Amino acid sequence: METMKIGNITLTWLDGGVTHMDGGAMFGVVPKPLWSKKYPVNEKNQIELRTDPILIQKDGLNIIIDAGIGYGKLTDKQKRNYGVTQESNVKPSLAALGLTVADIDVIAMTHLHFDHACGLTEYEGERLVSVFPNAVIYTSAVEWDEMRHPNIRSKNTYWKENWEAVAGQVKTFEDTLTITEGITMHHTGGHSDGHSVLICEDAGETAVHMADLMPTHAHRNPLWVLAYDDYPMTSIPQKQKWQAFAAEKDAWFIFYHDAEYRALQWEEDGSIKKSVKRMKR
């Protein structure tokens, strides 16, 4: 597992499974001859997208960003459609760190689409139960409302199987939430109406998790937004805002979906200054 430090904050990437989504959907109106130069694509026009939760450890707290694809939650048809070739191994990942799911204090849900929220619940016999029974689950109030009352478009990604069993653990926020000193969530909208980003700051160092406003390093251009985005004209200025914040702080960007990089810093000209590459198994 890859790990890095932001000041006294430790970040570790867990194994949350993998999807292979349509490249055209992931890059929206950007022509394939452009995006395919920046991110690998297979013969089915799919790109590899990890669904790997990021464990944040600070002040004795164990915090996870998003929950992975889950295990035993998807039908064969769903696995085919979403290119799922491996389900979540979050429990073994935690065990390798001397932790269990019961040790997780907080889950910071940037949004509640299935590829981020399936790992919140699991089947115990015929019944769905919480995977992280002791955790507070934070998400924006808008996202929580969207999850429980999806519209004709969003019902394909907001599933009751992912929220009903954990409803009692959820706490919402409006604009900004401080999880603990130096770790904050900020409602952005864009990808979904309730989408949020997460910032880690400690000892003069900063990491920015743009979540699905910038799911991979290839989405750095503010105009390269997803066809999946419900509000692309919100995504663009929010990307600009948080990229400017990151540039001012010389921040790292950390990724949940990227198959190549766990984290990186960019130079002003767009070249990569430093990186933590994903160790491919």
Curated annotation (Swiss-Prot):
Pfam families: Lactamase_B. Zn(2+) 1 binds at residues 111, 113, 191, 212. Induction: By the antimicrobial streptomycin, produced by the Gram-positive bacterium S.griseus. SMART domains: Lactamase_B. InterPro entries: MBL_superfamily_lactonases, Metallo-B-lactamas, RibonucZ/Hydroxyglut_hydro. The keyword Metal-binding applies. Zn(2+) 2 binds at residues 115-116, 212, 257. Its EC number is 3.1.1.-. The keyword Phosphoprotein applies. It comes from the Bacteria. Transmembrane segments: none annotated. The modification Phosphoserine is found at residue 36. Changing residue 36 to A: Does not abrogate the development of aerial mycelium in S.griseus. Binds 2 Zn(2+) ions per subunit. Its cofactor is Zn(2+). Belongs to the metallo-beta-lactamase superfamily. Probable hydrolase that is able to inhibit the signaling pathway required for the streptomycin production and development of aerial mycelium in S.griseus. Thus, serves as a defensive strategy against competing bacteria. The putative target for YtnP may be a gamma-butyrolactone termed A factor, which is the quorum-sensing signaling molecule that positively regulates streptomycin production and development of aerial hyphae in S.griseus. This is Probable quorum-quenching lactonase YtnP.
